[in-house]
């Protein structure tokens, strides 16, 4: 019995090492946020949610991509006074922002209307589905 008790600390050390090794292999948990709301205050609040999640959980543990389409496309505009600084700050934390080209055409927007941090995808909804098929978890503000 004494031998078993003496080996318990070793067991906990080995278990901890195993869990740590597993955590390293899984990497950050991926999320994709659908941004389809046109209200700039709601867009700002959604980006503030991302900022809080990144602060609390950390960029090493979570990966976030925002796909903006329909009226949500305006959330990524360089001249959006409510969201432009948040887009820049969150990009520095590793958050990726994607703008839908179909929505850009519908709103008559050009790539030059967006900050350099924004990537462009052919269509927003298929991008959302594609990322979820790849294992991203869905997040809608």
Q: Predicted regions span which residues?
A:
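N-terminal secretory signal peptides that target proteins for export/translocation
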Residues: 1-4
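Bacterial N-terminal signal peptides
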Residues: 7-17
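Secreted/extracellular ectodomain signature
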Residues: 21-141
């Amino acid at each position: 019995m004494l031998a078993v008790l003496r080996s318990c600390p070793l067991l906990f050390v080995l278990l901890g090492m195993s869990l740590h090794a597993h955590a390293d292999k899984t990497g950050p948990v991926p999320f994709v946020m659908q941004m389809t709301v046109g209200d700039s205050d709601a867009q700002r609040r959604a980006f503030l949610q991302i900022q809080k999640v990144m602060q609390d959980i950390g960029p090493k543990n979570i990966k976030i991509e925002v796909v903006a389409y329909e009226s949500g496309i305006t959330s990524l505009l360089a001249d959006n006074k409510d969201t432009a600084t948040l887009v820049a700050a969150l990009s520095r934390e590793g958050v990726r922002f994607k703008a839908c080209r179909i929505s850009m055409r519908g709103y008559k927007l050009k790539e030059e209307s967006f900050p350099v941090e924004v990537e462009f995808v052919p269509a927003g909804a298929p991008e959302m589905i594609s990322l979820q098929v790849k294992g991203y978890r869905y997040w809608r503000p």
